[in-house]
A protein has these predicted regions:
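HotDog/MaoC-like acyl-thioester-processing domains
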Residues: 2-6, 39, 69-70, 81-133
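Hot-dog-fold acyl-thioester-processing enzymes
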Residues: 2-57, 114-133
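Ser/Thr-centric signal marking residues that sit
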Residues: 15, 78, 107
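Intrinsically disordered, low-complexity regions of eukaryotic proteins
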Residues: 16-18, 61, 91
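Short, positively charged
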Residues: 45-46, 52-53, 71-74, 91-93
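Active-site beta-strand->loop segment that positions catalytic residues and contacts the acyl thioester
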Residues: 58-73, 79-85
């Protein structure tokens, strides 16, 4: 399935007293990577919301292998797990600048109608973009 690499530099404020990235920051890193994945596909998250579709996170899983630290440059590999329906699922691998695998993660998001506040199927234009090579 489609994949994309994003890069994030760890800021000092994102670390804890032990000098490692505070675990709560990983959700933000994954969101950055997801939005960049969509943009690389030609999808504007802002435009999608303006068209009445939102994508709240339904499930988030993280497995920490090694610690990310201040000033690390993280490479986040984002992959679509399978063709979306009502849900869209991503897997992630986060590496540091030394190409060490730090974190494995996955997220499941739900396509929702902003107007009706209920789940909907993945918009057809997204499915069409996923079919393109």
């Amino acid at each position: 399935m489609k994949s994309h690499s994003s890069y994030v530099k760890v800021r000092y404020a994102e670390t804890d007293q032990m000098g490692v990235v505070y675990h709560g920051n990983y959700a933000q890193y994954l969101e950055i990577a997801r939005i960049e994945w969509l943009a690389a596909l030609g999808i504007s998250y802002k435009k999608m919301e303006e068209e009445g579709v939102m994508l709240p996170v339904y499930e988030l899983n993280l497995r920490f292998k090694k610690s990310a630290k201040f000033d690390d440059v993280l490479q986040i590999e984002t992959k679509l797990f399978k063709t979306p329906g009502v849900r869209i699922e991503f897997t992630y691998e986060i590496y540091n600048q030394h190409e060490e695998l730090l974190t494995e993660a996955s997220t499941t998001l739900i396509f929702m109608s902003i107007e009706q506040n209920r789940p909907i199927k993945c918009p057809q234009y997204i499915l069409d973009l996923l079919k393109e090579d």
